[in-house]
Amino acid sequence: MSSKGKFYMTTAIAYTSGKPHIGNTYEIVLADAIARYKRLEGYDVYFQTGTDEHGQKIELKAEEKGITPKQFVDEVAGEVKRIWDLMNTSYDNFVRTTDEDHETQVKKIFKKLYDKGDIYKGSYEGLYCTPCESFWTESQLVDGKCPDCGREVQPAKEEAYFFKMSKYADRLIEHINTHPEFIQPVSRKNEMMNNFLLPGLQDLCVSRTSFSWGIPVDFDPKHVVYVWLDALTNYITKIGYDADGNSSDLFKKNWPADLHLIGKDIIRFHTIYWPIFLMALDLPLPKQVFGHPWLLQGGEKMSKSKGNVIYADDMVDLFGVDATRYFVLHEMPFENDGIITWELVVERFNSDLANILGNLVSRTISMSNKYFDGVVKSTGVTEEVDNDLKAVVTGARDKIADKMSGLRVADAITEVFNVFRRCNKYIDETAPWVLAKDEAKKDRLSEVLYNLTESIAIGASLLASFLPETAEKIAAQLNTGLRGFDELNQFGLYPNDNKVTEEPEILFARLDPKEVMPKVEAIRAAQKAEFEAEQKASGKEVETEAKADAAVIDIEPKEEITYDDFMKMQFQVGEIIECKAVEKSKKLLCSQVRIGSQVKQIVSGIRKQYTPEEMVGKKVMVLVNLKPAKLAGVLSEGMLLCAEDETGELALLTPEKDMPAGAEIC
């Protein structure tokens, strides 16, 4: 297949403040599936990932451990790369922002922007969030805390360099409006436009003097470059960009990037800061930035103190690499956060991998061995039922291509497994064991087994981008190779009289939850013990079980209502498609909520708990038929349901499983 041209894609580079959990690992697996699929389609792919290794947070972490920042990031970067390799990811370049070539170019870029007048020297006095490496004004805080992560901010006053963001704002707005594919999903675009660009951009602080772990400004070395100007530029520096005009052939071939794949929490940096930096450098903008959702443990953020952090290597130990890949790819919706629990992983392993796929391959090969000594042959004895099987199998390629073109990877995997589901149905329809009892139907039996083997061979090739090791194993057991893209809509390419393996390997043996869950509990216990040891070593108070698991609250009972009273209330699942802070209020958010075919505007007092960015894409429970009322002068047409603890902390109620917007709550 001839090349369709270049495809340069990147993940966000992982921040080296600690070991990545499964939610972080999801991104590299997602990127790998996209990269493998693009190669299958015929693209010349260059896939870059790596680690972000500078900043105050890392300096403080290293200080806590009594080692240098470089020693600290060397350890964490090594761990990140180990996990990326464990997950069988096919990146072409693993970058580190402490690499000498990157640091050299960052200094040049800073100087170039300074000489151009886009960076100027001033002084900063305001507020700084160390975990987010972000600057904020008082008006941007939510209840006095960082609007991104909810943590405390610290006063900061220092000499600093600033970038003239407002100079390029109108140009960026025009680009976003004329390139609807630039920010995906669309809900992320709406966030950036409504919450940042349209209200107006402030100049950005791009240097610090209060810590030293960073790339020094070449002409003013008491300053270090702000971590985001450092980190974002890796996408060009590590493919050979040179600010002096001597860029490499690799850069000239691959820039602009075709895809930046990032978490939704850092989309602001990639769709506002980064394109403006590129405009200032007179470079073209990336073609698309996709902000993927988060993977949450049982609907809540992972915490070492709770022992609920899930790491990729623990999942691999229990389920294997491809089963881990399958879960994170299959369970993540396009826009909404995904849910992971150990119990759900076991359920998917047994139902999808062991039953639908593994059992199909094993049964088919076993029947070929039992009835024909492993020889697979098409006899031409066809029946009407064969046509539908062939249509499903040969039609899958284009359906998957359509899903992958929109980065709907979970939907693409579902299409692959629809091939295997159709094969299982075909076995039930043709009943090979019945055909085997009648010698006159031997040729028909041979045709049935050929059709199954050919379908599985095509299915394995379609599966290869997502579960590469499993695809290779299936092809090996069928004694054939994986096919190219142009062959995946053709039926009948499996060689006649080919022989399958005599002893099929069990791809995925069913798991007994009673055996798995004790191992999970041991992992949780080890995590909590490690966390407590870390807390004690750093002199911090260890959170007690009672504090962590305060599980019950009694509230004042209200007057009883009748069943008829209750039935007057209409509850439905809603999907938040836009959200912004209500002006002149520190508590209120205004959300546009899709409920079925209609969109309602709902004002909620949850600004303390959620940022507008976090809200977009959530599926929530809504009281739909509440009489409209104005809150802080803004019309509200319903109510989002929340739970409240004894401290007044609120948490939105969300469906346990992904449900369509408009589904009735009953």
Model-identified regions with their sequence ranges:
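A glycine-rich helix N-cap at a beta->alpha junction
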Residues: G78-D92
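N-terminal catalytic cores of NTP/NDP-binding nucleotidyl/phosphoryl-transfer enzymes
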Residues: S2-V76, V95-F110, D115, C132, ...
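Cys/His-rich short segments
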Residues: K116-A169, I173
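Phosphate-backbone binding interfaces of nucleic-acid-interacting proteins
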Residues: V542-C666
